[in-house]
A protein has these predicted regions:
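Structured beta-strand/loop patches that form or line metal/cofactor-binding pockets in enzymes
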Residues: 1-48, 54
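Generic secondary-structure signature for well-ordered alpha-helical cores
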Residues: 8-11, 42-45, 71-74, 78, ...
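Metal-dependent enolase-superfamily TIM-barrel catalytic cores that perform enediolate-based chemistry
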Residues: 128-205
Length: 205
């Protein structure tokens, strides 16, 4: 089996819900670009992966796949994922890692289809189920977090992950408010997206 083509289909996601994961991102609804990466083989199998997000533009990513990486992929054995990774990962810098990641995901998808199993089986999964948690956006007040956490708990979610504003004093108040609201028997987590230095990480923790 050999790779014969690589295609990227770009579309617009209109009216993205007003969600944010940092205070620096506007909260109004907007339009985002997404893309589907397709790695096509001579045996009719295709590997698929998504590229892009609701929070960032695609920029030059689709062109990078077609102009830089497609010539490196066509003719390769798609099951030789590690060899392909070694050949393309030298370009891994900045935003290009998004592109390389999409290619890698598409290759895993293709390999799973060739084997007739889900991707997680190829990766050695052994559980039949895993616990799921609810994740917040960024809000401006502790009360909003507390209300949302209670709502998720009542809906049966087993844990709640807080994306705080990344202001240590406020983040501590948010954690305290959520803990009071959901009780001591409910798991909460904090994802500050690399915002703290070491002293503040210890302080908030």
């Amino acid at each position: 089996m050999r790779i014969t083509d690589v295609k990227v289909t770009v579309w617009e996601w209109k009216d993205v819900p007003p969600t944010r994961y940092t205070l620096r991102v506007k909260t109004g609804s907007r339009t985002a670009q997404m893309a589907l990466v397709r790695i096509i083989t001579d045996e009719g199998l295709e590997g698929h992966a998504f590229l892009g997000s609701a929070l960032s533009a695609l920029g030059n990513d689709p062109n990078l796949i077609i102009e830089r990486f497609k010539p490196m992929l066509v003719g390769q054995d798609p099951l030789a994922r590690e060899r392909i990774w070694q050949s393309i990962s030298g370009w891994a810098m900045g935003g290009i890692m998004r592109v390389i990641g999409a290619i890698d995901v598409a290759l895993w998808d293709l390999a799973a289809k060739a084997a007739g199993v889900p991707v997680h089986r190829l990766m050695g999964s052994f559980r039949e189920s895993v616990p799921a948690y609810a994740s917040s956006a960024v809000f401006e007040s502790a009360e909003e977090y507390a209300q949302e956490a209670v709502s998720f708990k009542e809906k049966g979610w087993t844990a709640y992950k807080i994306h705080p504003p990344a202001i240590p004093e406020l983040d501590i108040k948010i954690c305290e408010a959520v803990r009071v609201a959901v009780g001591d028997d409910y798991r909460i987590m904090l994802d500050s997206t690399w915002s703290y230095d070491y002293p503040n990480a210890l302080r908030v923790g």
